[in-house]
């Protein structure tokens, strides 16, 4: 996740994860995970709908999700998986520690290696 090369950018990539991957909801976010057949670093995409708020609020939510991923990845790198993190309205009001806890729980439930 350290560089932009490991991000999902294209709509087709997001749709592939959404249709074939596992969806795990939590109060702060929704995680969609799709395993890959390699051990390359995780490719991660972030999305926040307009339902959450205006552009300023959505971008802040996206930044908080990105930082939560960085915190989790520092402990143990995520490999061989494509992830999509969807910001919810509840993301805004949660403390950062609660958001990181939500991410850890959803990764564990999705069975992502490196999240145990």
UniProtKB/Swiss-Prot annotation:
InterPro entries: Ribosomal_Su5_D2-typ_SF, Ribsml_uS5_D2-typ_fold_subgr, RNase_P
Keywords: Endonuclease, Hydrolase, Nuclease, RNA-binding, tRNA processing
GO cellular component: ribonuclease P complex
GO biological process: tRNA 5'-leader removal
Gene3D superfamilies for the chain: 3.30.230.10
Reactions catalysed according to its record: Endonucleolytic cleavage of RNA, removing 5'-extranucleotides from tRNA precursor
EC number: 3.1.26.5
GO molecular function: 3'-tRNA processing endoribonuclease activity; ribonuclease P activity; tRNA binding
Function (record text): RNaseP catalyzes the removal of the 5'-leader sequence from pre-tRNA to produce the mature 5'-terminus. It can also cleave other RNA substrates such as 4.5S RNA. The protein component plays an auxiliary but essential role in vivo by binding to the 5'-leader sequence and broadening the substrate specificity of the ribozyme.
NCBIfam families named in the record: rnpA (TIGR00188)
Family indicated by similarity: Belongs to the RnpA family.
PANTHER family in alphabetical order: RIBONUCLEASE P PROTEIN COMPONENT (PTHR33992:SF1)
Subunit structure: Consists of a catalytic RNA component (M1 or rnpB) and a protein subunit.
Protein's UniProt name: Ribonuclease P protein component
Gene source species: Gluconacetobacter diazotrophicus (strain ATCC 49037 / DSM 5601 / CCUG 37298 / CIP 103539 / LMG 7603 / PAl5)
